[in-house]
């Protein structure tokens, strides 16, 4: 899905919870540890959102391409990139670059937004198609534990003074979570209301590992959060590092 109303408020609600500079350094460490290609400084930030991570990766020295399906999010990203980063409006299943990159990152549970296994398989195939042999695909996902115990059927409220947000979750037995966001922006004595609706799905490790293998990736490691340790039973975020095998990627429809 592509954010619309959420784009205007994303950085205020999410930005304060994420240290993008630290996250960029963490991804950089993983890329340097596992990548084996002369193209590794050419990097794709897939589902780049408002571009905060893209900017930090660019500052480290990567030649960054940012891709997102939301034109509204990319408008925010372009203002931050100041012409130094190429931003493209593309969905996972229509990813189309001019050549291969040495590294692909996909952060902040973006892949959880793909709620159909066949669609996730297609997305992995597109990523493999544009990843150079020896290049790496680094992504994070919300875990089944987070969907079951943290998101669940809970409601979260954010009060930022002039901006009020109600975040409501409904999670089913398959660990697909429907998320309803209602934003109230104050202007004087009045409030403007906007809403956003989307779904996220938790995938098992076995499913992710199988789809990566089918796409032409070797799974190098799975880490918890921003660590280099394996995920524990109560891990809310898992980071996958996979290396592109030599040879053809999986067939792309």
Go through the PLM ranges and name each one:
Residues 1-47:
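Conserved class I S-adenosyl-L-methionine
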Residues 44, 51-94:
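Class I SAM-dependent methyltransferase SAM/SAH-binding core
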Residues 121-133:
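A short glycine-rich, Lys/Arg-flanked "PGG" loop and its adjoining helix->strand segment in the class I
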Residues 205-253:
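C-terminal lobe and adjacent flexible extensions of AdoMet/dcAdoMet transferase-like proteins
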